[in-house]
Design a protein with these regions (language model features):
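Juxtamembrane intracellular "pre-TM" segments in multi-pass secondary transporters
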Residues: 2-16, 197-230, 414-438
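Central cavity-lining transmembrane alpha-helices of secondary-active solute carriers
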Residues: 53-71, 266-278
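Helix-to-loop junctions at the C-terminal end of transmembrane segments
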Residues: 65-77, 163, 275-287, 372
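Structural signature of the two symmetry-related core transmembrane helices
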Residues: 81-95, 182, 290-305, 393
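C-terminal membrane-cytosol helix-exit motif in multi-pass small-molecule transporters
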Residues: 159, 182-201, 399-407
Length: 438
């Protein structure tokens, strides 16, 4: 294959400690507000089409500038300044959300925050890839994701409880969580100063940071990366189609409280935390492709549950399922992306992947919002949403099959079937019997 894997260098535990700290504190910051932004928009009066714009902007804006940021990072061979700057900007721009009074204002602030803060995303992925041994990417990624999930889970639960207890306007309910998001966001950025990064500029990422021709050439020279990107495009459109509808179902159909909204995220996070260490080890033993396919197939159940839900408890069940597939799937997806990108181009190619999928998510979410608006106008709120969810579920099934075309860039010591067989054999399915008695 044309792409080289990251050099096999051992990860220094002391070097990784700031990454764990950043993951926990940063996810605590986003966890206090992020899970409630869709509900915030709905309570501000957003329609289905406006929720389509909300989700579309939330997906495209973070990815618009990632390619030039990633390319610039590759050119100068530095990651920390971008992670630090992106985190500080993101934290500061939580402040305007304290004063928004309409869904349009909320969308505008989120867009600006996402564009300016996006410099941290491709550089964070590149830094992780550089600091970890290639044979331990799955396990190390799972541990970092687990640390992040713990921070987010605790923050979401605390924020949901506070919002239920605080009486007053919508802005007053969000005031304390937003202040916490600002403080933790600043802290998570400053902790990256502790990482000792040695500059390693290279000439592989040449040309203008806004250049397209050289990026296209690098992508075309990476067939495994291209195949992965194409599969993500197909699945991503149908996956994002249902995103604008989740908050509408939660608030307008099921009348969930802020604490119940928090529990939806917390349950999923708790399940993911419990299973992610095993998921990381499994990814490194059996490879990425099988788990990615299973992950994508499992996501069919999410819009299905939302379509049929008549109680918030049904969404809790969906959160359990989502937590299981995320524990294995997200680790496998991220590890595979690192596997099929060259180290010296990882920032650029990661940003390209995020940009392409972000555009797809933008189109899918916008289409889903307007489609739901049209269907709800004809068939009513519940049945109109159910039809949109059905299209998303069917499309997810078709898109999941495109990941079967992925090629593993290396061999692995086991298979999913072998691992499952070993687990079954260890289970006490039948009591042992002694010798037959006469």
């Amino acid at each position: 294959m044309s792409q080289n894997l990251t050099a096999d260098k051992p990860s220094d535990n002391n070097e990784l400690k700031p990454l764990y700290a950043r993951s926990i504190i940063n996810s605590f910051s986003s966890g206090t507000v992020g899970p409630f932004l869709g509900v915030y928009a709905v309570k501000l009066g957003a329609s289905a089409s406006e929720m389509g714009w909300f989700q579309s902007v939330s997906n495209l804006a973070p990815n618009m500038m990632q390619m030039p940021w990633g390319k610039l990072s590759d050119k100068i061979g530095r990651r920390i300044p971008f992670i630090l700057g992106g985190g500080l900007v993101t934290a500061a721009l939580w402040v305007p959300l304290m004063f928004v009074t309409s869904a349009t204002q909320l969308i505008a602030v989120i867009a600006v925050q996402a564009v300016l803060g996006s410099m941290a995303t491709p550089t964070w992925a590149a830094l992780i890839g550089e600091l970890m041994h290639s044979s331990k990417r799955g396990m190390t990624t799972a541990m970092i994701n687990r640390a992040a999930a713990i921070g987010s889970l605790l923050a979401t639960l605390a924020a949901g409880y506070l919002m239920v207890m605080i009486k007053g306007t919508l802005q007053q309910m969000f005031l304390i969580p937003l202040i916490v998001a600002v403080v933790c966001g600043l802290a998570s950025s400053l902790v990256m100063i502790l990482v000792n990064e040695k500059p390693h500029p290279n000439n592989a990422s040449n040309g203008s940071i806004f250049g397209i021709r050289d990026i296209t050439r690098h992508v075309n020279n990476s067939p495994d990366f291209m195949r992965f990107t194409k599969a993500s495009i197909v699945f991503g459109f149908f996956m994002s189609l249902s995103w604008p509808l989740f908050s509408i179902t939660t608030v307008n159909v099921l009348n969930a409280s802020m604490l119940e909204v928090a529990l939806i995220s917390v349950i999923q996070g708790a399940v993911t935390i419990a299973l992610q260490p095993w998921g990381g080890k499994l990814v490194d033993r059996v490879g990425r492709r099988q788990l990615i396919v299973g992950y994508r197939l499992g996501l069919i159940l999410v819009p299905t549950f939302y379509a049929l839900a008549s109680s918030v408890y049904h969404l809790y069940i969906a959160s359990v399922i989502f937590g299981i597939v995320v524990a294995f799937g997200e680790v496998a997806m991220f590890a595979y992306l690192l596997d099929v990108t060259q180290e010296e181009l990882r920032g650029t190619l990661t940003a390209f992947y995020n940009l392409v999928t972000g555009i797809v998510f933008f189109v899918g979410s916008l289409f889903g919002g307007y489609l739901a608006n049209y269907l709800v106008g004809i068939y009513g709120l519940v049945f109109g949403l159910q039809l949109a969810y059905a299209l998303s579920a069917i499309g997810r099934g078709i898109g999941a099959l495109t990941f079967t075309t992925l090629r593993e860039p290396r061999r692995y010591p086991s298979t999913l079937r072998k691992e499952f067989r070993e687990i079954v054999q260890k289970l006490p399915l039948m009591p042992e019997r002694g010798p037959a008695q006469p």
